[in-house]
């Protein structure tokens, strides 16, 4: 494998993967295909060697462009997605266009040219798990964990389109022999993350003198994983994974939102209770 395409490679998680590949695998040339929406940024790719990397600005739903690029590559790693839950409730169409139609264009091209395909997805396709205190036996903290056998139960236009794209890939593997793998990862944090996301939003608010807001009681639990660990896992799946398999990526880093906000405040030299409780979002 000498050439790979990384869709969404100018976004948060995708750009971290591009840096990971360039830094750790000197024989690989990376082509980034990115629409450069508000979540994508050329600066995320600054400093990369020009002979190892190319940025193509375009839409993954552009079948002609995708066909041209895929015909010249050895593998596609598909990160590109509309991923903001709140935005999906306001206008679902971009999520259908990118997450469903875009995925279709990519897997069709990979099928046509017999190109290896890895599909990066999210644990949000599984919906919400109950906290331990809501399960028989009581107690506090994390309850069940997702497994590869957990049924899909998406709860928003975003997560439903990601679930739909996962199922498209599974169908193309079974129906057409697509050489594909899927990974569903938990919440990422790390460099280049957009300020709309939970951790950078709290940090930015504190730096700006704005009191961080905690929705509800802050009991929502997320498993947090650093993007470097996620990138390493995706590369391992791409190069060693079994075709047709789905891999769950996590870090056993479960923390509730309240704990995360308090930790950020303490690390930034503030009173850990210097946040504001607001009504939970519907």
Residue spans of the language-model regions?
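N-terminal Rossmann-like NAD(P)+-binding domain of SDR-like oxidoreductases, especially those catalyzing
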Residues: 1-188
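C-terminal substrate-binding subdomain of Rossmann-fold SDR/epimerase-dehydratase oxidoreductases
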Residues: 4, 17, 30, 58-61, ...
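Short acidic-hydrophobic sequence patches enriched in Asp/Glu that either
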Residues: 37, 194, 198, 256
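Conserved strand-to-helix beginnings and helix N-cap segments that scaffold or border functional pockets
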Residues: 42, 67, 89, 195-196, ...
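Histidine kinase transmitter module recognition
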Residues: 109, 172-175, 191, 205, ...
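Short beta-loop-alpha junction of Rossmann-like oxidoreductase domains
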Residues: 129-130, 191-193, 197
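Hydrophobic alpha-helix immediately C-terminal to the catalytic Tyr-X-X-X-Lys motif of short-chain
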Residues: 164, 168, 172, 202, ...
């Amino acid at each position: 494998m000498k050439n790979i395409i990384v869709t969404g490679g100018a976004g948060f998680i995708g750009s971290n993967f591009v840096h990971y590949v360039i830094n750790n695998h000197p024989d690989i040339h990376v082509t980034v295909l990115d629409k450069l929406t508000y979540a994508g940024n050329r600066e995320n790719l600054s400093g990369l060697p020009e002979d190892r990397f190319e940025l193509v600005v375009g839409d993954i739903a552009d079948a002609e462009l995708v066909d041209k690029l895929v015909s010249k590559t050895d593998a596609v790693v598909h990160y590109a997605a509309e991923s903001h839950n709140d935005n999906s409730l306001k206008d679902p169409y971009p999520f259908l266009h990118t997450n469903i139609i875009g995925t279709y264009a990519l897997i069709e091209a990979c099928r046509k040219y017999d190109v290896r395909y890895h599909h990066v997805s999210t644990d949000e396709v599984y919906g919400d798990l109950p906290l331990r205190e809501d399960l028989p036996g009581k107690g506090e903290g994390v309850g069940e964990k997702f497994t590869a056998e957990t049924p899909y139960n998406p709860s928003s236009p975003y997560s439903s389109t990601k679930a739909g794209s996962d199922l498209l890939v599974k169908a193309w593997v079974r129906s057409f022999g697509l050489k594909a793998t899927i990974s569903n990862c938990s919440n990422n944090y790390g460099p280049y993350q957009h300020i709309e996301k939970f951790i950078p939003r709290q940090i930015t608010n504190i730096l700006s003198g704005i009191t961080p807001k905690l929705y509800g009681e802050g009991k929502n639990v997320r498993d947090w994983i650093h993007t470097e660990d996620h990138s390493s896992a995706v590369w391992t799946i791409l190069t060693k994974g079994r075709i047709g398999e789905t891999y769950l990526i996590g870090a056993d880093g479960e923390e509730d939102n309240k704990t995360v906000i308090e930790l950020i405040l303490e690390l930034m030299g503030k009173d850990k209770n210097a946040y504001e409780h607001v009504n939970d979002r519907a």
